[in-house]
């Protein structure tokens, strides 16, 4: 998860944000399933990229020059930091804060393989 403050990129341009979300997904090595986006009135954008490995979402507040980004991936194939690096490069924030969470470890969920339709998981106590 990342927060970008003082962004100087076009935060209210849906096509721009969608295009760069797709590019960010490509940078991670993830498998893109679908991209959904919405522009809010009077301003603000949400774009969600559904991935075989999970998702990437971005929410913009142009009036605050603020962006929230979540990159949630399973397994070791994807490199989520590359998505953040790409978005940071095009949105040009003055300040960035990143929090990394390891999800599922305490539940024993282990991703065993990926398929075009998504990840196959098993519980470690099975």
Q: For each predicted feature, which ranges?
A:
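Polybasic/polar functional segments that serve as interface/processing modules
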Residues: 1-126
């Amino acid at each position: 998860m990342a927060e970008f403050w003082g962004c100087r990129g076009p935060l209210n341009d849906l096509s721009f944000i969608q295009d760069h979300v797709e590019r960010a997904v490509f940078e991670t090595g993830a498998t893109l399933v679908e991209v959904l986006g919405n522009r809010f009135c009077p301003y603000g954008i949400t774009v969600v990229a559904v991935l075989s490995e999970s998702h990437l979402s971005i929410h913009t507040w142009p009036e605050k020059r603020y962006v929230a980004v979540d990159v949630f991936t399973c397994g070791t194939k994807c490199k989520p930091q590359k998505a953040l690096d790409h978005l940071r490069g095009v949105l040009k924030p003055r300040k960035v804060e990143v929090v990394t969470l390891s999800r599922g470890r305490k539940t024993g969920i282990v991703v065993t393989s990926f398929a075009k339709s998504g990840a196959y998981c098993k519980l470690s106590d099975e």
